[in-house]
Design a protein with these regions (language model features):
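Alpha/beta enzyme core
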Residues: 1-159, 165
């Protein structure tokens, strides 16, 4: 409904892609959305800044990404891939997943719950695509401002709970 009342690009959270990434992408394109992000958690997902998350295996996520990319009809529709690996597997496995997700066709990477500037920087050093940062006031990431994230090479930042505090 948001995309019906604005000309601004609208990106939505597609959780784990629902039952079919192909159907999800097709539906979102038909509704006029600019993109979506899908994540590598199991279907019974949790907030990215909570503990006890479970991930699907990297190869399964790669298949979801390829399915999403192949089903996309509008080359400008952004396929953003979120990884929750940092708090589950650590930064090295996160970087490994990011490389695989980019190779599968992700347009933008959303590395969830990076602890500090060093981790954000490590992601930027290995990533070849656009990057999204999530700055939630009550999360695991150190709060960085737009300029700090821009200087770290991040292209988009979201503040998901800020408006709830106003």
């Amino acid at each position: 409904q948001i995309s019906r009342v604005t000309d601004l690009p609208t990106i939505v959270d597609a959780d784990t892609g629902f039952d079919s990434c192909a159907k999800t992408i097709s539906t979102f394109e038909q509704k006029g959305l600019a993109g979506c992000h899908i994540e590598d958690q199991i279907a019974e997902k949790r907030c990215g800044h909570l503990d006890n998350k479970e991930l699907i295996i990297k190869e399964e996520m790669v298949k979801k990404i390829k399915q999403s990319v192949e089903s996309r009809k509008d080359k400008n529709f952004l396929i953003i891939v979120r990884t929750d690996a940092n708090t589950v597997e650590g930064i090295d496995k996160t970087l490994d997943r990011i490389k695989a997700y980019e190779d599968a066709g992700a347009d933008m990477i959303f590395p969830e719950a990076m602890k500090d500037e060093k981790e954000f920087e490590k992601v930027r050093k290995i990533s070849k695509v656009f990057l999204l940062a999530n700055m939630t006031e009550f999360g695991k990431s150190k709060l960085l401002n737009k300029t700090e994230l821009e200087n770290l090479g991040y292209n988009l930042v979201i503040y998901p709970v800020t408006t709830q505090r106003l």
